[in-house]
């Protein structure tokens, strides 16, 4: 029979406590393992390019997202835009004109102008641009009357004749300067 030792732990004087019995072979094995682990402090031996890394590269290639990279061909030359014929341009102009006539914001601003309100610079610019575009479209479609708008009636202020240089000079010479001194 092999020899067994009792372990000595402080406070184990009483017989009630558990006694640990170790055999010599167990303690030798434990000490060898501890010594072996103590010696190995660095990394495992081997080269950087081990066979295990090749399998990792293959796995990484398989895990790649299939959405990366499109198989759709990309045109290298920009195609020229298709030109519209007269009929298509006329339809497009009619649609744009109808859209401008239905523009709610433009209608509200025109109503405000009719009521005599003054618009801000930005709003007035917006109204002018839209009205100019409507005029161009109507001209393209042949809806615009060629008659010029009637000129506004002249105001009731009497118009003065333009004075000649001689009249202005005589008026200046007759001017009483003392009247303007304080």
Swiss-Prot record:
Regions of compositional bias (Basic residues) in chain numbering: 33-47
Keyword line: GTPase activation, Ribosome biogenesis
Hydrolase listed as a keyword: no
Residue ranges, annotated region (Disordered): 1-79, 143-182
Biased composition (Basic and acidic residues): 23-32
GO BP of this protein: ribosome biogenesis
Listed GO MF terms: GTPase activator activity
InterPro entries attached to this UniProt entry: YihI
Oxidoreductase as UniProt keyword: no
Annotated Pfam families: YihI (PF04220)
Similarity field: Belongs to the YihI family.
Subunit-structure text: Interacts with Der.
Function: A GTPase-activating protein (GAP) that modifies Der/EngA GTPase function. May play a role in ribosome biogenesis.
Protein name: Der GTPase-activating protein YihI
Originating organism: Vibrio cholerae serotype O1 (strain ATCC 39315 / El Tor Inaba N16961)
């Amino acid at each position: 029979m092999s020899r067994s030792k009792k372990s000595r732990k402080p406070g184990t004087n009483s017989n009630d406590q558990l006694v640990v019995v170790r055999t010599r072979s167990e303690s030798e094995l434990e000490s060898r393992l501890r010594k072996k682990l103590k010696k190995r402090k660095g990394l495992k031996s081997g080269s950087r390019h081990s066979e295990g890394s090749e399998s990792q590269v293959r796995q990484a290639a398989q895990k790649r997202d299939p959405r990366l990279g499109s198989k759709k061909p990309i045109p290298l030359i920009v195609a020229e835009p298709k030109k519209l014929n007269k009929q298509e341009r006329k339809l497009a102009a009619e649609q744009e004109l109808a859209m401008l006539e239905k523009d709610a914001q433009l209608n509200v601003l025109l109503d405000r102008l009719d009521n005599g309100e003054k618009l801000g610079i930005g709003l007035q610019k917006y109204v002018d641009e839209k009205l100019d575009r409507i005029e161009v479209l109507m001209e393209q479609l042949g809806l615009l009357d060629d008659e010029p708008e009637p000129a506004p009636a002249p105001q009731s202020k009497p118009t003065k004749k333009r004075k000649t240089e001689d009249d202005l000079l005589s008026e200046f010479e007759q001017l009483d300067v003392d009247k303007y001194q304080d």
